[in-house]
């Protein structure tokens, strides 16, 4: 990697961020991407990217003092729509001040949770390492990826009437061949190609027995999606080992733990996890342990009554250390050392144990 810090145009920064963290993975309710855009952001020379989990007013001033030219705030500082722009609300003051100082603000939020190599992968990989690397993880709710070829067509042929070279050529020009034999052809196409193919198939109807179309607009992703379900191989590990590992990963002194109400002590083989507020995600999978930033009182009671452990760490404690551990080096590599990446020193969880 080059050690020379130079600059990158704003347009390229936005493009590369979108490639690293695809925004289409964000939850529908979320507010992600470029949230504050000073004029001519595309042509700006971005020299210093400032990372924070929460963009508070003191953290924004820290970014200004650090001469940041671009802010990535994991949590979106702007969420609700507003009809006026004034100094009455914190979020609007942050937006105004960032524009006055010509600093764009970008938030990846739930897209970073769900992407391959994102926040939940960071946590699941650390848990698997506690078991000597023996285990695997998958999304609790896999992302449904759109396909370029949205239609699959199967054509069943009379074995004694092979298709002519001209017909095969026309099929190939208007679709993607997936399978071909003397009695069957499988191909895929997009919606625009479909009508052309239907008319083409009708033109050689004497050569075929029948044909069908399957809509395949969505496919489940193997790596992208909400939360992670971790399965540990062999006998699993003790809850105390996981508690220690979680504290070290999140760089915190304390976690809160709920134990099975039966008093039963058991090894942990399955862990359902989600950074932040994961109550709507983690309980979609049955697990020995539920790990997240925050849960409601009754959700914890219910899980413990069903014989599971629960670990909650406070919301942003389960997210913050991803920035220096993973995102900072990833961005330095992404921009080949041409941008200096700074992590906030003031950003911290608002709740403290005393």
Curated annotation (Swiss-Prot):
InterPro entries (UniProt xref): DUF34/NIF3 (IPR002678), DUF34/NIF3_animal (IPR017222), DUF34/NIF3_sf (IPR036069)
GO cellular component, one term: cytoplasm
Record-stated family: Belongs to the GTP cyclohydrolase I type 2/NIF3 family.
Protein name as annotated: NIF3-like protein 1
Organism name: Dictyostelium discoideum (Social amoeba)
Gene this chain is encoded by: nif3
């Amino acid at each position: 990697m080059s050690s020379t810090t130079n600059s990158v145009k704003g347009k390229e920064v936005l493009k590369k961020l979108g490639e690293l963290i695809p925004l289409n993975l964000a939850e529908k309710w979320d507010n992600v991407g470029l949230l504050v855009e000073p004029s001519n952001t595309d042509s700006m020379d971005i020299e210093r990217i400032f990372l924070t989990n929460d963009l508070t007013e003191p953290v924004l001033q820290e970014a200004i003092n650090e001469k940041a030219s671009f802010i990535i705030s994991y949590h979106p500082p702007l969420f609700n729509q507003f009809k006026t722009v004034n100094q009455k609300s914190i979020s609007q003051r942050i937006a105004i001040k960032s524009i006055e100082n010509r600093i764009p603000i970008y938030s990846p939020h739930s897209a970073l949770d769900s992407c391959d190599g994102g926040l939940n992968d960071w946590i699941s990989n650390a848990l698997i390492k506690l078991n000597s690397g023996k285990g695997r993880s998958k999304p609790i709710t896999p992302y449904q990826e759109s396909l370029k070829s949205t239609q699959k067509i199967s054509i069943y042929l009379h074995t004694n009437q092979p298709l002519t070279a001209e017909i095969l050529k026309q099929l190939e020009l208007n679709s993607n061949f997936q399978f071909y034999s003397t009695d069957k052809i499988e191909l895929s196409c997009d919606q625009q190609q479909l009508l052309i193919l239907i008319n083409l198939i009708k033109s050689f109807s004497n050569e075929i027995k029948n044909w069908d179309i399957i809509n395949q607009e969505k496919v489940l992703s193997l790596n992208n999606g909400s939360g992670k379900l971790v399965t540990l191989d062999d006998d699993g590990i003790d809850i105390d080992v996981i508690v220690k590992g979680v504290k070290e990963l999140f760089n915190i002194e304390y976690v809160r733990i709920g134990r099975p109400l039966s008093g039963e002590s058991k090894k942990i083989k399955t862990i359902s996890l989600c950074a932040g507020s994961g109550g709507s995600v983690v309980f979609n999978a049955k697990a020995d342990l539920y790990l997240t930033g925050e849960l409601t009182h009754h959700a914890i009671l219910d899980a413990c009554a069903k014989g599971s452990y629960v670990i909650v760490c406070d919301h942003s404690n389960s997210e913050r250390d991803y920035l220096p551990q993973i995102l900072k080096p990833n961005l330095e590599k992404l921009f080949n050392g041409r941008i200096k990446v700074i992590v906030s020193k003031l950003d911290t969880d608002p709740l403290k144990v005393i």
